[in-house]
From Swiss-Prot:
Keywords, in A-Z order: DNA replication, Plasmid, Plasmid copy control
Cell membrane in keyword set: no
Pfam families: IncFII_repA (PF02387)
Protein name: Probable replication-associated protein repA2
Highest taxon listed in the record's lineage: Bacteria
Designated gene of the protein: repA2
Species this chain originates from: Buchnera aphidicola subsp. Acyrthosiphon pisum (strain APS) (Acyrthosiphon pisum symbiotic bacterium)
Length: 250
């Protein structure tokens, strides 16, 4: 196959299934905002440090967006918004469903489905950049990929052109406490409100706030695995990202 044709579907786009979901005012607003901008050209794609989700270290080698991955990103971001649950911060669709409805899945001649284009975009770009957080699902599925829950972070909404004040406005009206949410599934660990507060603090106080947020986000066993050095590294990275973000916006 010629190199220029190695990508199937050069111009993917999100085409939701016919079962129309009832979308909240916030989701309608967010999807309108994201349709007006090019998420692949956001300054956040250059300003944020890519982080290895497993180790918390800055990735020394990181594949930035090429034109094909940028096209995939433009398709999958509105899809994630469409299936987003504002209460749980969860994208209520599997990676396979997102891939199918964005035209990012392929079938081989033998009938095997591949969702690599979508799954790699998430695991190799969106998650390291801090736009989403993923949690593996324990499953007995015989498929070739590990199913994951996808949570959208405050950074994701900044990517979509939604300001912290706007999302806080919607959250204060719509969000309801979910008692059954597991501790580690309570959204991304730093909220928009926290980010704004932390950005106005001196460095020592800001780092303390980030430390407390990390402790609340991870389980005791996860913190033990991370260790003191790993925790310090995570604080350094999050503080650096916060400084870069608000420096860009100021």
């Amino acid at each position: 196959m010629p190199r220029k044709n190695y990508i199937y579907n050069l111009k993917p786009f999100f085409n939701p299934s016919k079962n129309e979901r009832k979308k909240s005012t916030f989701i309608c607003y967010a999807m309108k905002k994201v349709s007006e901008i090019d998420v692949a050209r956001s300054h956040l794609n250059r300003a944020l440090l890519p982080i290895d989700p497993k180790t918390g270290n800055v990735l020394p080698r990181f594949r930035r967006l090429n034109k094909h991955r940028a096209c995939a990103m433009r398709a999958i971001v509105p899809a994630m918004l469409y299936y987003f649950n504002i209460n749980s911060k969860l994208v209520e669709a599997s990676i396979e469903k997102l891939a199918d409805e964005c035209g990012l899945s392929t079938l081989s001649d033998s009938g095997n489905k591949s969702i690599t284009r979508a799954s790699r975009l998430i695991s190799e770009f969106l998650e390291p950049m801090g736009f989403v957080k993923c949690k593996k699902i324990n499953s007995k599925s015989m498929s070739n990929y590990i199913p994951k829950k996808i949570f959208l972070t405050p950074m994701f909404f900044m990517l979509c052109g939604i300001s912290p004040s706007e999302i806080n406005h919607f959250l204060s009206k719509k969000i309801k406490p979910l008692k059954k949410l597991k501790k580690q599934e309570k959204s991304a660990f730093i909220s928009f409100t926290d980010m704004k507060i932390i950005s106005q603090l001196d460095e020592r106080s800001a780092r303390t706030k980030i430390l407390n947020a990390l402790i609340n986000y991870y389980t005791a066993s996860e913190l033990t695995k991370i260790g003191p050095k790993g925790l310090k590294k995570k604080i350094d990275i999050e503080y650096s990202n916060l400084c870069n973000l608000y420096k860009k916006k100021s």
